[in-house]
Amino acid sequence: MLKALYDYGLRRQLTLPPGFIGKTVKAYISLSENDDRVSIYLGDDELLPCPDMGSLAQGRDKCNVLVEKRSIVIPDAPADGAKPAAKSAFFLETLRDASEEEPLLKVCVRALETPEITEAIRAELDRMKIKPGDRISFRVNGNSMVESEKIRRWWREYRKRFAKGDASSAKLCLITGEPTAPMMTTIPIQGLLLSLIHISEPTRP
């Protein structure tokens, strides 16, 4: 019964698949396969299904994939010889892995690995007043990487390694049957009180 209800919700886009959560994106780093020009494309208030690491992103060496804070995706220029922060290194590592499924991500990887392009991105983000805590992502050839079905397919497989690596905290989802890390807290349900009030109102003649 629960599985049938869940599948119905997925088909009707009433819920998100395991490993995804709705997020807004403040800005996109817009890149092209044809040249090294950089521009910033502002996002909006639309909630997009984004890969979500859950509580693992709160640790020291992991972060969310594809959509993260500017301070992680494009950190301040490191001092000479300094290694990138662990979270920034992990973000780049996941992009490399995902680029095997979605080749357009290779453009993003190259940009983050090229100091001149990274500095141009940093300057454009500053010009557009994108703050360190704002969530950002990528567009390549005008295509939002957040909406790439290839990346979503990659993420569904990639995320399984974290459940396997931490078997002590992994539990089976009652609906999907997949191993998952249980949420320590849940997102508040919006609009429920209003709906209940509306339902409980007496019928007026």
Write out the residue ranges for each language-model feature.
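Conserved phosphate-interacting/catalytic interface
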Residues: 1-171, 200, 204
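Short cysteine-rich clusters marking metal-coordination/redox-active sites
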Residues: 173-176
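Domain-exit/linker segments immediately C-terminal to small folded modules
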Residues: 178-200, 204
